Amino acid sequence: MPRFENSFVVDQQIDSVWKFYTDIKHLEIITPKKLELKIIKCTNPEIILGQECWIEGKIIMKKIKWHSKITFFRKHEYTDEMIEGPFKKWIHTHRFSDLGNMKTKIIDEIEYELPFGLLRKMLNKYSKIQLEKIFNHRKNITCLKLNKK
């Protein structure tokens, strides 16, 4: 099963980063505009264990719907799993590490599986490239919003 990992450091204390990332609205802020991501409904405005969200967006010019659930939650770490959506499987773990000196490391680990049988191998490469672009954008926006002035 393919894995995608990404990490970066933001110049901000961990509690401020945690507060930003556990407000579900952050997702619309850090996602590239071309994906047209919209949060349709969530069972809670803050990310907590058991929270479910329904999201809409675009992937490869096609509107998709995504239903996810927070399946693991503790201070400075949570995991969301796709219940229904464009992937056969999607498990995304978010971790935040205090580096001291007003620096926080943000770590994303994603295990995913694409549908499409025989096309899967070809699409895996494309998916990794797209994930790299999306998470580079997330890094840039997060740093813009949170880096201490």
What is each stretch, according to the model?
Residues 1-48:
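Hydrophobic ligand-binding cavity/cleft-lining segments
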Residues 82-133:
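Beta-strand/loop substructures that line and gate deep hydrophobic ligand-binding cavities in soluble
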Residues 4-6, 53-55, 66-68, 92, ...:
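Hydrophobic residues positioned within well-ordered beta-strands of beta-sheet architectures
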Residues 17-21, 27, 53, 70, ...:
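Hydrophobic pocket/interface hotspot
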